[in-house]
């Protein structure tokens, strides 16, 4: 199979990640923070080492990183933990439903108000689109780093600066950028970062994280056992226990730890360079095919991540993807859990076909995809 659906989840996983998962099942299937025996302590140490690796990669304090089942849960923690009745929030027109639906639910229930900022391939215009929506009660700006549909990259550093100049919390959804684009909480002015493990960090499914800068106060939407302060009914104030109730996914965390090592060993910049070059090649070939409709300008790494949406002739996107699937090429068709993005780009009638490479994707596979598509 030629796998070009890495925006959904990277596949294959590195052998080191597979080995780590097996090792975790054999040696670290103990409840961390719940026992003083050696195996429990060793498990706790392994989990903290993963926090330290995330801290090194993204710049957040290790103790401010909490593990979640996925990025969607992390985003819900961020949005619902920050906003209070009467608050206003700004999101973008390229948000995944992981952002749009929690915000809309709070709005529908009369708790908050929100506005949506347009994306422009002119960086200054994008920043101004956010700026003009700021109100006295704006509490947060939530922004995807890279669109999961069209690959559009937001200028998060500048948007974060704008937020901080106005006393606004800046939350970044890094589902499509963690492990692919460089991210640093300080230089990028990020207050809260949410990301999955199973995409650009090459971890197993079922593990993600939320990371906070110091002095960011966040409420809870889940309370329970944390292994600490058990004789108090109130959820602990300190991180990461504040956002980690219940038994952790040790296997996923240790797999994530190995995934981070894999990415760090190759370097984020080299992974991005490989994927960018593949996407430039694919884009150039598709642009010469009169039957292909592309929705973004010629591939430019200043504003595009290695994600590409297209359509073929006037076919429904599912028909194109089904044809490719019959030829053993995996991609994603439809609306990609992103109503706002498809509405913004005018593809809400038939969706798009999305392709996305990984560090394991080969030029020969991309060439075969291009040649097979011509036969549709």
Briefly describe each language-model feature range.
Residues 1-376:
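Pyridoxal 5′-phosphate
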């Amino acid at each position: 199979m030629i796998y070009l659906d890495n925006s959904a989840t990277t596949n294959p996983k590195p052998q080191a990640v597979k080995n780590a998962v097996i090792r975790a099942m054999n040696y670290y299937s103990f409840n961390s923070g719940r026992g003083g025996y050696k195996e429990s302590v060793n498990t706790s140490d392994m989990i903290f080492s993963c926090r330290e690796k995330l801290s090194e990669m993204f710049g957040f304090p290790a103790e401010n990183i909490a593990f979640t089942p996925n990025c969607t849960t992390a985003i819900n923690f961020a949005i619902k933990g920050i906003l209070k009745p009467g608050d206003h929030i700004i999101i973008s027109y390229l948000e995944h439903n992981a952002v749009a639906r929690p915000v809309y639910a709070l709005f529908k229930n009369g708790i908050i108000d929100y506005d949506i900022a347009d994306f422009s391939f002119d960086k200054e215009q994008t920043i101004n689109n956010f700026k003009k929506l700021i109100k006295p009660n704006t509490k947060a700006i939530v922004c995807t780093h890279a669109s999961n549909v069209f690959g559009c990259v937001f200028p998060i550093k500048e948007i974060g600066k704008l937020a901080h100049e106005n006393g606004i919390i800046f939350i970044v959804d890094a589902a499509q950028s963690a492990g692919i684009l460089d991210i640093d909480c300080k230089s990028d002015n990020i207050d809260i970062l949410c990301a999955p493990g199973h995409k650009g960090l090459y971890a197993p499914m079922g593990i993600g994280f939320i990371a906070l800068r110091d002095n960011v106060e966040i409420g809870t939407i889940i309370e329970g056992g944390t292994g600490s302060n058990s004789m108090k009914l109130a959820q602990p104030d300190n991180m990461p226990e504040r956002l980690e109730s219940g038994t952790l996914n040790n296997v996923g965390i240790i797999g994530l730890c190995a995934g981070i090592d894999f990415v760090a060993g190759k370097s984020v910049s080299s992974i991005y360079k490989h994927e960018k070059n593949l996407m430039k090649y694919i884009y150039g070939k598709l642009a010469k095919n009169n039957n292909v409709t592309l929705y973004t300008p010629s591939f430019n790494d200043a504003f595009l991540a290695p994600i590409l949406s297209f359509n073929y002739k006037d076919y429904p996107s599912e028909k194109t993807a089904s044809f490719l699937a019959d030829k053993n090429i995996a991609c994603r068709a439809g609306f990609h859990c992103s109503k706002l993005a498809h509405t913004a780009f005018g593809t809400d009638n038939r969706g798009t076909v999305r392709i996305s490479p990984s560090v394991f994707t080969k030029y020969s596979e991309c060439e075969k995809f291009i040649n097979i598509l011509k036969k549709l």
